[in-house]
Amino acid sequence: MATPRSAKKAARKSGSKSAKCGLIFPVGRVGGMMRRGQYARRIGASGAVYLAAVLEYLTAELLELSVKAAAQSGKKRCRLNPRTVMLAARHDDDIGTLLKNVTLSHSGVVPSVSKAVAKKKGGKKGRATPSA
């Protein structure tokens, strides 16, 4: 005969914390890293779930922006590389401020022309006007 305690255990769903929360990022691993990092004396169970959800959202947002940037490059095949990820992150206002001090390896620099170089001079040179 099953006791109430064993019946509850049998009724419980088995599976990872990520699957129970509907996340892709590993909640258990994030919680372990939070505990090992000693950011606080005590870490609640919902803290790891919340942090994993935030990381998953930011990753999905950056991936979506990167795919759009790679598709706009005009090439036939769309391939993500560190350069397209960096360009997408720098051109977005929110993610750009969040990743302002981050260096992505093998991504190069954001192309920009300084104002001093972009200034045009007053007269047009090179055109000869006919003096008839």
UniProtKB/Swiss-Prot annotation:
CDD domains found in the cross-reference section: HFD_H2A
Covalent S-S links between cysteines: none
SMART domains: H2A (SM00414)
Pfam hit, one: Histone
Major location category of this protein: nucleus
Entry-linked Gene3D superfamilies: Histone, subunit A
The UniProt record lists the keyword Transport: no
Keywords: Chromosome, DNA-binding, Nucleosome core, Nucleus
InterPro entries: Histone-fold (IPR009072), Histone_H2A (IPR002119), Histone_H2A/H2B/H3 (IPR007125), Histone_H2A_C (IPR032454), Histone_H2A_CS (IPR032458)
Keyword Nucleus: yes
One GO term describing the cellular component: nucleosome
Molecular-function GO term, any one: DNA binding
Subcellular location: Nucleus; Chromosome
Subunit structure as annotated in this protein's UniProt entry: The nucleosome is a histone octamer containing two molecules each of H2A, H2B, H3 and H4 assembled in one H3-H4 heterotetramer and two H2A-H2B heterodimers. The octamer wraps approximately 147 bp of DNA.
Reported function: Core component of nucleosome. Nucleosomes wrap and compact DNA into chromatin, limiting DNA accessibility to the cellular machineries which require DNA as a template. Histones thereby play a central role in transcription regulation, DNA repair, DNA replication and chromosomal stability. DNA accessibility is regulated via a complex set of post-translational modifications of histones, also called histone code, and nucleosome remodeling.
Family as reported in the entry's similarity comment: Belongs to the histone H2A family.
Name of this chain's protein: Histone H2A.2
